[in-house]
């Protein structure tokens, strides 16, 4: 058995280990019983709404997957079409599994908070997040290794494997856009009518949109985020393997083996790190989660050093891996600087809210723009270091390094919406106030980890898209026997740059408009219920929660189609015209997409935590004050920024890159 075959078997084995670890955490969650009927009723309603959304979304996506697979089979190859279908199915399974456990963990976290305080509640919420994290990387590693093994056995080209990444990317985009529209339509509707107009607290059971709001936390922040990082994870490995086979070396085997082994040991590191996240007295929750992430990173660096030595590769490759990993941690740190409660940036938003909503919005936008500086410098330094030490392959392996700890990052990130849901369930079930106080502490940490997760997703998207772009260039070079030169003085390249730069803004406009349209429907429905059922406010009548869930589901699925199709159609049209123009388009979209994504994510995070800071008594103000009402408006503007448009841009730049890579054989025929 040769080295590469051994590595693929290792990948399959580690993937299975990761899935078994996810199963262990799922059983930990299920160990806690929901013994309060009201909690069980609300948990079941949230689960039913979340799974109904996924079922409706997948019905639409099945048609899309079949159409694209047939086109790939006709114009590229049948194996590419098969890999595309497998990528789509695997991404859907990962999202479905994460959603199922998250909608079990939420009610159990509320019960744990009531019976065991912060320590037990953290245990349940984090276990729910760990299931998502370890499922994402376990499925990714298992399926990718299996496909590579089968392709070697039957003699299929590695280029066909890129279809797997395209399938994962396609599902990820629709999951992010659809989930993002759903969650923010419900959130904006619940906030504007409930908090601002009716003056009732967040998650109050009298608010008709409150169940839809809690369903949205799962479809957007669990399934959507998991699909996003799943796509980055497999995309970075595929890009690196593609580049490895195109390297001018006698034996590409160690270069192909490196990303698989590094990712496999990253999974082991993540599993070990998840075991360290526990607290006996409920103190220092944020510190425990941060420590777990750092442990995963340190273990991965140590393992990577051994792997590079074992494979006999140049140490420059190791330095590129470290550059990627460190860049991920530094970007996460700077995200916290601009979005954490108590930090200067968030204080600026809270202060600005004192003079009204307009000044709060202006300050948030300024913070978002300012927050792009440090992450972009970090990404630029990581790119330069990795290129100097390993060439284009170095940039790709840096992306693999950054994403090696995805299991732990997703676990920490997915814990947030579980904790948020637990607070909502506690409020709606009218559990004792101290239960809500406990879940609020977890949720406050969850907001910070979610912001950090978004920063990580953006940074990893930048490196993954760049590595896919490099693979695209090398693939064109190989098929045309001449170097593809992306010269900025070439009119075709300039045209592509402008179109790519514009796509970011068009895509953001479409997703923001979609949230606005869906939110208007939600606001009108909530107002109608308050108007026609006056007994809701004095609790003598029950709101129609199901109607609000139906509105969010229908609107989000209808509005997600155009942005999703746009991301695939535009690179195809430009690529058929000119491979140089397509190169320019990918470069233009990469630059503007990363900048816009960071700005939107951090502005939204600052508005969100600025509002929460006021709710905690900032400068003597509290819920219902003029300062708080202004901050709620800012947070409402920030909701589609940080949870719909911003995160969707990550996938836009990656999907266009991998579509371009997969379709290179078609494009060169038209040159």
Curated annotation (Swiss-Prot):
EC number: 7.2.3.1
Underlying gene: hppA
Determinant of potassium dependence, annotated site positions: 450
Binding-site residues for Mg(2+) 1, renumbered to this chain: 187, 191
Family label: Belongs to the H(+)-translocating pyrophosphatase (TC 3.A.10) family. K(+)-stimulated subfamily.
Any one GO biological process: sodium ion transport
InterPro entries: PPase-energised_H-pump
Protein name per the record: Putative K(+)-stimulated pyrophosphate-energized sodium pump
HAMAP family the UniProt entry points to: PPase_energized_pump
Localization, UniProt: Cell inner membrane
Binding sites annotated in the UniProt record for Mg(2+) 2: 214, 217, 420
Oligomer status and interactors: Homodimer.
GO molecular function: diphosphate hydrolysis-driven proton transmembrane transporter activity; inorganic diphosphate phosphatase activity; magnesium ion binding; potassium ion binding
Swiss-Prot/TrEMBL site (Important for ion transport) positions: 176, 221, 228, 643, 654
Native source species: Fusobacterium nucleatum subsp. nucleatum (strain ATCC 25586 / DSM 15643 / BCRC 10681 / CIP 101130 / JCM 8532 / KCTC 2640 / LMG 13131 / VPI 4355)
Chain positions recorded as substrate binding sites: 184, 642
Any one cellular-component term (Gene Ontology): plasma membrane
Highest taxon of the lineage: Bacteria
Catalytic reaction(s) noted: Na(+)(in) + diphosphate + H2O = Na(+)(out) + 2 phosphate + H(+)
Annotated binding of Ca(2+), by residue: 608, 635, 639
